[in-house]
């Protein structure tokens, strides 16, 4: 029930990664990356399926060898989302996966080789209608740029990116997006701000090597939150030393917090104190796990007492306000006659949320069908 995001997004051109539109106002796509051995086809496909279940839009797969490229051919046949091939050092691997139907090629300017090699990659991409991501990283800048600046700086990342933008422009190839990632929040933010002023191509956001699940999520939320709040960014990846599924969840949570893209339940819950009348923390944790399959956007407030409970419930799709024995229940901001038994809160609230989601989905379906008439 909260208002739409006030953020005005940066104008950018449109490309397609498989069937996913990127840029020019398209929904910001959430990406992740497999961390299996790509030559282990079964494990890699299993992980991609796990990412698909939590709503990933695009998955990147590392292709370090020709054996991995051959495995990618089998992986691509079993994936339901677009796959990006992550290519370093050997440009010939990019040429091979282009033959196997890759949806996007990620190349690193710092190690892909000279312009002649890039020309071959671009020729293959053009022939197969495959977009390219220029993936600049503060940890692998070209040697001459490292010597010029002494250390990674926003200007150094920008120079690396623009050097390869110029090559693609000379080759009359405009189907590309760019990233300028760094592990330092301020370095990455500064580089993206500079790049956003220079080009109109879509930007892929990320804080690279952000860290473990907790610290990495915080760093990514700060860095990407700053950029997204300024309208910068068309795709994103949360880089965590953790299960890639967590990357997708955190990515959607950041977009949800900024009201840029809503997917699933936005839980509004109090941190609890001695005034709580039911187990708020246990209720929220259980419902987050049980309702992971729901994609319907809605705000659900779960507040343990009447201090802030009614106010939050009045601006939520569904809301619970703690009271002794039985708690108040709100729907669309209106208090209902029915009250929820505190002893059975989780099951009751799950049923209410699923019923509301079904109703909202049906209303949306009817609205779409009427527009089609």
Curated annotation (Swiss-Prot):
Binds 1 [4Fe-4S] cluster. Coiled coil: none annotated. Its cofactor is [4Fe-4S] cluster. The keyword Membrane does not apply. It holds the Pfam family GcpE. GO terms for biological process: isopentenyl diphosphate biosynthetic process, methylerythritol 4-phosphate pathway; terpenoid biosynthetic process. Transmembrane segments: none annotated. It catalyses: (2E)-4-hydroxy-3-methylbut-2-enyl diphosphate + oxidized [flavodoxin] + H2O + 2 H(+) = 2-C-methyl-D-erythritol 2,4-cyclic diphosphate + reduced [flavodoxin]. Its EC number is 1.17.7.3. Converts 2C-methyl-D-erythritol 2,4-cyclodiphosphate (ME-2,4cPP) into 1-hydroxy-2-methyl-2-(E)-butenyl 4-diphosphate. Belongs to the IspG family. This is 4-hydroxy-3-methylbut-2-en-1-yl diphosphate synthase (flavodoxin). It comes from Photorhabdus laumondii subsp. laumondii (strain DSM 15139 / CIP 105565 / TT01) (Photorhabdus luminescens subsp. laumondii). The lineage of its organism: Bacteria, Pseudomonadati, Pseudomonadota, Gammaproteobacteria, Enterobacterales. The gene is ispG.
């Amino acid at each position: 029930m909260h208002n739409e995001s006030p953020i005005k997004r940066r104008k950018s051109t449109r490309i397609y990664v498989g069937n996913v539109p990127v840029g020019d106002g398209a929904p910001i796509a959430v990406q992740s990356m497999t961390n299996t051995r790509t030559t282990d086809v079964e494990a890699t496909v299993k992980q991609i399926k796990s990412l698909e279940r939590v709503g990933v839009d695009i998955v990147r797969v590392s292709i370090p060898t020709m054996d991995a490229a051959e495995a990618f051919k089998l992986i691509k046949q079993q994936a339901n989302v677009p796959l990006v091939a992550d290519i370093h050092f050997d440009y010939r691997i990019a040429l091979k996966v282009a033959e196997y139907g890759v949806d996007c090629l990620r190349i690193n300017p710092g190690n892909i080789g000279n312009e002649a090699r890039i020309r071959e990659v671009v020729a293959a991409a053009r022939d197969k209608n495959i977009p390219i991501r220029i993936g600049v990283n503060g940890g692998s800048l070209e040697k001459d740029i490292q010597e010029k600046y002494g250390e990674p700086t926003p200007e150094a990342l920008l120079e690396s990116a623009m050097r390869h933008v110029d090559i693609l422009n000379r080759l009359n190839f405009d189907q590309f997006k760019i990233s300028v990632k760094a592990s330092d929040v301020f370095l990455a933010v500064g580089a993206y701000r500079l790049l956003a002023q220079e080009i109109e191509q879509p930007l892929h956001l990320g804080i690279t090597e952000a860290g473990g699940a907790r610290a990495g999520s915080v760093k990514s939320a700060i860095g990407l939150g700053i950029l997204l709040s300024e309208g910068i960014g068309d795709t994103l990846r949360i880089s965590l030393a953790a299960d890639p599924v967590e990357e997708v969840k955190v990515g959607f949570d950041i977009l949800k917090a900024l009201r840029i893209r809503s997917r699933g339940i936005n839980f509004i819950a109090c941190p609890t104190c001695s005034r709580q009348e039911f187990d708020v923390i246990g209720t929220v944790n259980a419902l987050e796990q049980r309702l992971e399959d729901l994609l319907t956007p809605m705000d659900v407030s779960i507040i343990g007492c009447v201090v802030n409970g009614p106010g939050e419930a009045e601006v939520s799709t569904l809301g619970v306000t703690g009271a002794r024995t039985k708690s108040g229940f709100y729907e669309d901001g209106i208090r209902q006659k029915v009250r929820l038994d505190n002893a059975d809160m989780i099951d009751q609230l799950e049923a209410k949320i699923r019923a509301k989601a079904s109703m909202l989905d049906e209303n949306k379906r009817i609205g779409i069908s009427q527009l089609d008439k």
